[in-house]
């Protein structure tokens, strides 16, 4: 008895797990989301740290800024003091001129008649100072001449110590000492002549003072208050003038320090700019040899992080493994697969079951699966 022919066994069975959308294992999906969030947080923290490091000032900048502030404060203070000193000098000069003019009006012509005497006294005082300086130079020249002669004597003793042999070292020393003696002798003669000259001038100036003092004694006594006041005022003016000159030099030095600090700051700024430029160039590294950038990444853009790519590959492999495990119960599956996921042949499931001698015909079925590389 023949059995009824059943329907065709060519039935496409759905791949287990294909009906579900989303990740096959929820744990892997959650792990992927957590890892992605962790990567983003780490990237954001790294960017924040990098910006914080870049924003951190170079300690040299703080030092130079402190020096700049100190120099600026010093310049302001010195300029104020300089203005005050100049104002005081002008005030004293005006007051001195007013007082001297008033006193000259009271004394009359005796001031002009006694002026040669005070001028001779001034020249005599300068001659005395020149004489003192010339005397010091002459004494120093005499000492140098005596030391040079002593050196010549020592060198001569060394040369004549060994009569059988002439030592070139002692000979050179003797020549050098002889030159020093000649130079010292010339300096001594020149200093002696200068000292005699200024001494003679000093004597002449003192003699002239004595002569004028005798001839202009009455006018000298009458005009003495004027010239004494003038001498006092000149001393005060010289002190203020020296203070003004000193403050001007201090201001100039402070401005030099200020400009030097500005140059240092400019140099530090250039170094920081060059270092940041070099860091930005080093951060844009090329991919390793053999690695291919994803097609979606354009030139000048950065692709996804390496950890994200590894996580996506892990999810794909896990999905394929689950698909392979879910069809282990299927029998007689073909082992020939293609890269695009299509089977090269159909599987016939004509396994017949014989019950009580009857011959049953089973239907063939196919199963499609894909292999991910």
From Swiss-Prot:
Compositional bias (Polar residues): 34-45
Gene Ontology terms, MF aspect: guanyl-nucleotide exchange factor activity
Entry protein name: SH3 domain-binding protein 5-like
Functional description taken from the UniProt entry: Functions as a guanine nucleotide exchange factor (GEF) for rab11a.
One GO-annotated biological process of the protein: intracellular signal transduction
InterPro entries: SH3BP5
Cited Pfam families: SH3BP5
Segments forming a coiled coil: 55-98, 170-272
Superkingdom of the source species: Eukaryota
